[in-house]
Amino acid sequence: MEAEPSQPPNGSWPLGQNGSDVETSMATSLTFSSYYQHSSPVAAMFIAAYVLIFLLCMVGNTLVCFIVLKNRHMRTVTNMFILNLAVSDLLVGIFCMPTTLVDNLITGWPFDNATCKMSGLVQGMSVSASVFTLVAIAVERFRCIVHPFREKLTLRKALFTIAVIWALALLIMCPSAVTLTVTREEHHFMLDARNRSYPLYSCWEAWPEKGMRKVYTAVLFAHIYLVPLALIVVMYVRIARKLCQAPGPARDTEEAVAEGGRTSRRRARVVHMLVMVALFFTLSWLPLWVLLLLIDYGELSELQLHLLSVYAFPLAHWLAFFHSSANPIIYGYFNENFRRGFQAAFRAQLCWPPWAAHKQAYSERPNRLLRRRVVVDVQPSDSGLPSESGPSSGVPGPGRLPLRNGRVAHQDGPGEGPGCNHMPLTIPAWNI
């Protein structure tokens, strides 16, 4: 692109001003910025950091999608939500990370108006869908642990919920897509390494009034961060209380006491994981939202705005995007079924026959399951509704309780008939 003159032709000088006065006025009103916002070492550091989380996001979320779609036994309600979370995080990696990195490295917007609108819309929708899916996972865990005998979600209802999530994400980001536009910054130019000047273009929300942008920022903050965070914290606190209040095995044998100690340690690990999930979401997105609110509501000087846009925003965006890269680890690796599904899928592809991998991954040996379960105390229910969260939705027989992942827990202890006051419900520790 050819450089435009930094001064207009002589015929455009306003009447009543001589040439020297105009030259002085133009020299003081024009702003020149470097084409690259950072030095080479700083830019290399940002590029390496963004490439790292991009690769983690692509590999981790692709593996989650592969495991769920490859194994029919993994297509449970919660895993459908985790699959949707992986899809939305993949969109974050594809559409958010590269454009944000480019926008943070160079001055101005290098793409056209259509890319400006579509990039903003897809970015906002993918982030919103990711956050809304985290809430859906928390609600589903809450229903299965705190209220295990209430009617469970079916796969059809889960898919409908996912469709609603994306519809809400589209609805909340429509104002941004409408107002986003590419505008040329008057009296502001970019300079390359050879001192050639280029016009500066920006992709930003052109609201009719500045106050409307402030209101929209507050709405986004409430719907994409504050309310989801409150719901996630409330749900996980209730789950943690339920786990902590659950009694151990009723038998007083030495083996039962030892199993009770192991159960307590497993409960503690589950509670720690729930705390980690809530804290990680809070800390990942809080810096970016603080900066966005400062831009709209803080009375910042030009120097402060420049420092925030050049240094603070790239770090805040990186931290928020890291959340999408770490979700497969939090919701996938810490889930026993995902670990076994991953092993089964790759053993079947690499060297094992499919039937052997399937048998190894989904073995229902009682001693293995017993070591990985958490006992939760629940009240008996007269409804006897089976769990429809998994592939097995048949009505459980006497002495058996439905689990959220479609398995059945056998109750073979004494005094566990219909007249028993409390029934222990076993739940896989990392599947909540």
UniProtKB/Swiss-Prot annotation:
Domain of life: Eukaryota
Cytoplasmic-facing ranges: 65-80, 139-158, 236-273, 331-432
GO biological process: cellular response to hormone stimulus; G protein-coupled receptor signaling pathway; neuropeptide signaling pathway
Compartment list: Cell membrane
Any single Gene Ontology cellular-component annotation: cilium
Extent of Low complexity compositional bias: 380-406
Disulfide pattern: C116-C203
Lipoprotein among keywords: no
Entry's transmembrane regions: 44-64, 81-101, 118-138, 159-179, 215-235, 274-294, 310-330
UniProt entry keywords in alphabetical sequence: Cell membrane, Disulfide bond, G-protein coupled receptor, Glycoprotein, Membrane, Receptor, Transducer, Transmembrane, Transmembrane helix
Region of interest: Disordered: 380-422
Tissues showing expression: Expressed at high levels in the hypothalamus. Moderate levels found in the midbrain, thalamus, medulla oblongata, testis, eye, whole brain, cerebral cortex, striatum, hippocampus, cerebellum, optic nerve, placenta, spinal cord, pituitary gland and ovary.
Keyword Membrane included in the entry's annotation: yes
Record: glycosylation sites: N10, N18, N113, N195
Membrane-side (Extracellular) residue stretches: 1-43, 102-117, 180-214, 295-309
InterPro entries, sorted: GPCR_Rhodpsn, GPCR_Rhodpsn_7TM, NPFF_rcpt, NPFF_rcpt_1
GO MF term set: G protein-coupled receptor activity; neuropeptide receptor activity
Chief place of localization: membrane
Topological relation to the membrane, as annotated: Multi-pass membrane protein
Function field: Receptor for NPAF (A-18-F-amide) and NPFF (F-8-F-amide) neuropeptides, also known as morphine-modulating peptides. Can also be activated by a variety of naturally occurring or synthetic FMRF-amide like ligands. This receptor mediates its action by association with G proteins that activate a phosphatidylinositol-calcium second messenger system.
Entry's family note: Belongs to the G-protein coupled receptor 1 family.
Protein name: Neuropeptide FF receptor 1
Taxonomy of the source species: Eukaryota, Metazoa, Chordata, Craniata, Vertebrata
